[in-house]
A protein has these predicted regions:
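Active-site neighborhoods and metal-handling regions in enzymes and metal-associated proteins
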Residues: 125-356
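Short loop segments at secondary-structure junctions
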Residues: 9-11, 84-89, 104-105, 233-235, ...
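"Short basic amphipathic alpha-helical interaction patches in structured regions
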Residues: 28, 95-97, 225-230
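Short, charged/polar surface micro-motifs in flexible loops or helix N-caps
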Residues: 9-12, 20-22, 86-88, 185-190
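Short, well-ordered beta-strand micro-motif
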Residues: 6, 80-84, 101, 230, ...
C-alpha cells in the first residue's frame, strides 16, 4: 500500500471520494508485479490528475488490527511518500469526485486513525531535515568567525563558507547557486538580487564590518541564515556589548531588538502585509532605514524559488499558513555607509513562534 502526502504551491492536496463527505490523501494498493514507488506515482496521477510532480519516499509504516481494508488484522506495511505537484490535468479517472487544495489540514478525515498520524510523521521528519540544514548554516558562521582576519579577500571568505557548507551536509545552494553572499565595509549597505551578485575584490581591514548571508540546501530543503560580523583591532568581536565602534554596536543592537519585537508582535493570524507595515514603521521610529532592494523583510521557505511569498505590502497571506518563513531586516542609519543584517528561519509550533 502507498499513501502520498502532497502539496501544490504551498497548499495541501486532498481528495474527496464520490460516495463520501470526507477527505483523504491519495493512495492505494500495489498491483501484481508493481514497484511500490510506481504504485505511489500511479495512484497520485489517478486520484489527483497530477501530470507534473516530484515524488519521494518518506518512510515505511505498519498497521495492525482489523480495519476496512484488512479483515485478518495481521500487520500490514505501507510506503509513505511526499509529492510536490506542479501541474494538474484537471481530469480524474477514478472513484474520486474532486481534488481540493487546502491551507489547513481537514477535520473530517476518511481515515482518521491513520492518515493524520502519517502527516504528523511527515511533518516531524521534515522539521528534522530543515533543522539539520539550518544548523549547517549556523555552524558555518561559527566556523568563519574563527577564520576571518585582516588581509583576507571577500572571495576567499565566500569560498571557505561554501566549502564548509558542503562538508557539513549541503549538496547545493538554492539562491542562484551562491552559497555565501559576502559584503564588507561600505558595501554592507548594498542590496542586490542574487542573480546580479558578484563578490568584490575587497580585503578585510583591521577594523571592519562584514555581512554574510548563507543559502545551503540538501535536496530541496533550504537553509537561510545571515549574520553581521565585526572585526576590531584585527579580531572578531563576538559579544555585541564589547564592540567599541558605537555606530556598529547600535546597528547590531537594533537587529536584536527587531527579532525580539517579532516574537512580541506576531501570531499565526498576522498577515505578511501586517508584519511588513509594522516592522518598517518600527525601523523608522528607531532611526533606521530598510535597505532591501525590494523593500521586503523576509519570505516563505519553499522548495522552488518562484513559489516564495514575501513580507511585503498587499500580501494578505497569514504567517501561520506557511510552514516556515525568514525574518531578515537589512538596515542602516540614515546617510550611513554601513549596513546590518540578521536572518533566522521561524515557524509556529502550535500557537508559539519558534526559531528553527
Amino acid at each position: 500500500f502507498a499513501v502520498i502526502i502532497s502539496q501544490s504551491n504551498g497548499k495541501w492536496v486532498f481528495c474527496k471520494h464520490k460516495e463520501r463527505d470526507t477527505y483523504e490523501a491519495p493512495g492505494g494498493h500495489r498491483e501484481a508485479g508493481e514497484d511500490i514507488l510506481e504504485t505511489a506515482k500511479r495512484e497520485l496521477q489517478e486520484e489527483t490528475g497530477a501530470i507534473q510532480f516530484d515524488i519521494k519516499s518518506i518512510c515505511v509504516y505498519s498497521v495492525t488490527g482489523k480495519n476496512s481494508v484488512n479483515e485478518t488484522g495481521e500487520e500490514t506495511f505501507g510506503l509513505l511518500c511526499f509529492a510536490e505537484i506542479r501541474e494538474f490535468s484537471g481530469e480524474l479517472h477514478c472513484e474520486m469526485e474532486k481534488v481540493v487544495l487546502m491551507d489547513e489540514l481537514p477535520e473530517n478525515w476518511t481515515y482518521p486513525l491513520i492518515q493524520p498520524k502519517l502527516i504528523e510523521k511527515y511533518l516531524q521528519i521534515q522539521k528534522q531535515s530543515y533543522s539539520q540544514i539550518q544548523q549547517t548554516a549556523k555552524q558555518t558562521i561559527a566556523y568563519i568567525k574563527k577564520i576571518i582576519k585582516p588581509g583576507m579577500k571577500l572571495f576567499d571568505i565566500r569560498k571557505l563558507c561554501e566549502k564548509k557548507l558542503m562538508e557539513l551536509g549541503a549538496d547545493s545552494f538554492w539562491y542562484w547557486d551562491v552559497g555565501a553572499f559576502v559584503f564588507a565595509g561600505d558595501e554592507t549597505t548594498v542590496s542586490v538580487s542574487g542573480k546580479q551578485y558578484v563578490t568584490s575584490d575587497k580585503i578585510i581591514e583591521n577594523n571592519d564590518i562584514i555581512t554574510i548571508d548563507l543559502s545551503p540546501q540538501v535536496g530541496n530543503i533550504w537553509g537561510d541564515y545571515a549574520r553581521t560580523i565585526i572585526v576590531e583591532n584585527g579580531k572578531v568581536v563576538d559579544d555585541i556589548e564589547l564592540i567599541q565602534n558605537q555606530e556598529w554596536k547600535s546597528g547590531l543592537q537594533m537587529e536584536e531588538k527587531l527579532h525580539t519585537e517579532l516574537f512580541r508582535f506576531v501570531t499565526k493570524e498576522t498577515t505578511f502585509e501586517e508584519l511588513y507595515y509594522y516592522m518598517n514603521e518600527f525601523i523608522v521610529e528607531n532611526g533606521f532605514v530598510n535597505l532591501d532592494f525590494m523593500g521586503n523583510l523576509g519570505h516563505s521557505i519553499v522548495k522552488v524559488k518562484s513559489d516564495r511569498i514575501y513580507i511585503e505590502k498587499e500580501n494578505k497571506a497569514k504567517l501561520g499558513a506557511v510552514n516556515y518563513f525568514t525574518f531578515e531586516p537589512h538596515i542602516a542609519f540614515h546617510d550611513s555607509k554601513y549596513g546590518y543584517k540578521k536572518e533566522n528561519i521561524y515557524y509556529f509550533d502550535g500557537d508559539v513562534l519558534v526559531e528553527l
